[in-house]
């Protein structure tokens, strides 16, 4: 059996950060996720999904996400219930996030009403490689050796 959820959407309000009596951080937020189809009026509708994240990722979400921020959530669906102050049984379905990705630059959420954005950061916990634009001038590369072969003794290599 599998219980896996991957969502991309925008926060409807700033994350709510709290701490348990044991000191564990927990943040809750609602993610507005557009549906892939349009309604009869040709408009896209959204689902508003409650998300919970724990410990250090909760603190990061509270510090770096705010209303309108685009975020990716990877986690699982959880259902729970409790008795409210009136004695009624309340059922809750939420996503417990195992990871939260910040999908736009920190200062970009102010203009979040526009869906036209350039994703400048690509984060993945499973990808150990990163790419960046390097200065390709020969002056900055001390190992360029002006195109000549490098004489290295195989005994000097650590592998």
From Swiss-Prot:
The keyword Lipoprotein does not apply. Residues 114-127 have a biased composition (Low complexity). The keyword Transport does not apply. It comes from Listeria innocua serovar 6a (strain ATCC BAA-680 / CLIP 11262). CDD domains: SSB_OBF. Signal peptide: none annotated. PROSITE patterns: SSB. This is Single-stranded DNA-binding protein 2. One of its GO terms (biological process) is DNA replication. Residues 2-104 form the SSB domain. HAMAP family: SSB. Residues 106-159 are annotated as: Disordered. Gene3D superfamilies: Nucleic acid-binding proteins. Homotetramer. Keywords: DNA-binding. GO terms for cellular component: nucleoid. Pfam families: SSB.
């Amino acid at each position: 059996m599998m219980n896996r959820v991957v969502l991309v959407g925008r926060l409807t309000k700033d994350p709510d950060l709290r701490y348990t009596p044991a000191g564990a951080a927990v943040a809750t937020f609602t993610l507005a996720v557009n549906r892939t189809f349009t309604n009869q009026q040709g408009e896209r509708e959204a689902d508003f999904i409650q998300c919970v994240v724990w410990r250090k990722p909760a603190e990061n979400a509270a510090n770096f996400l705010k209303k309108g921020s685009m975020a990716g959530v990877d986690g699982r669906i959880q259902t729970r219930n409790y008795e409210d102050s009136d004695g009624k049984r309340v059922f809750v379905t939420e996503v417990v996030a195992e990871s939260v990705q910040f999908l736009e630059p920190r200062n970009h959420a102010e203009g979040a009403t526009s869906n036209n954005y350039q994703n400048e950061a690509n984060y993945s916990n499973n990808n150990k490689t990163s790419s960046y634009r390097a200065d390709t001038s020969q002056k900055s590369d001390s190992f360029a050796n002006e195109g000549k072969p490098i004489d290295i003794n195989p005994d000097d290599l650590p592998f």
